[in-house]
Curated annotation (Swiss-Prot):
UniProt entry tagged with the keyword ATP-binding: yes
Main subcellular location: host cell
Sequence similarity: Belongs to the orthopoxvirus OPG142 family.
Free-text function comment from the UniProt entry: Late protein which is a part of a large complex required for early virion morphogenesis. This complex participates in the formation of virosomes and the incorporation of virosomal contents into nascent immature virions. Required for the stability and kinase activity of OPG054.
The protein's name in its UniProt record: Core protein OPG142
Keywords: ATP-binding, DNA-binding, Helicase, Host cytoplasm, Hydrolase, Late protein, Nucleotide-binding, Phosphoprotein, Transcription, Transcription regulation, Transcription termination, Virion
GO cellular component: host cell cytoplasm; virion component
Single GO MF annotation: helicase activity
GO biological process, any: DNA-templated transcription termination
Entry coiled-coil feature ranges: none
Record flagged with keyword Hydrolase: yes
Cell location: Host cytoplasm; Virion
Subunit text: Part of a complex composed of the kinase OPG054, OPG092, OPG100, OPG114, OPG115, OPG142 and OPG157.
Length: 94
């Protein structure tokens, strides 16, 4: 996923699929990245928030905070999950 330079990244586990606006992969958290447990502030310079693997409580906290400070920006949610095949084989009985 491409992340804008004016975006804030809030994560529970760091994803492996983030790229900045120039196309380089963001390997490690930087100064615009926070965990859900850390404190952060939103201001007018931040145009969007990327939430990575949030819990339902984390989503609710961010939504309440956004509404309370009347921040007008976009929120994007990214869920990462392993693609594990089912323990059985699907068979088509034609």
């Amino acid at each position: 996923m491409f992340v804008d330079d004016n975006s804030l990244i809030i994560y529970s586990t760091w994803p492996s699929t983030l790229s900045d606006s120039s196309g380089r992969v963001i390997v490690m958290p930087d100064n615009r990245s926070f965990t859900f447990k850390e404190g952060f502030k939103l201001d007018e310079s931040i145009k969007s928030i990327l939430l990575v693997n949030p819990s339902s409580i984390d989503l609710l906290k961010i939504r309440v905070y956004k509404h309370r400070i009347k921040w007008m920006g976009d929120i994007f949610v990214l869920f990462e999950q392993e693609n594990i095949p089912p323990p059985f084989r699907l068979v088509n009985d034609k």
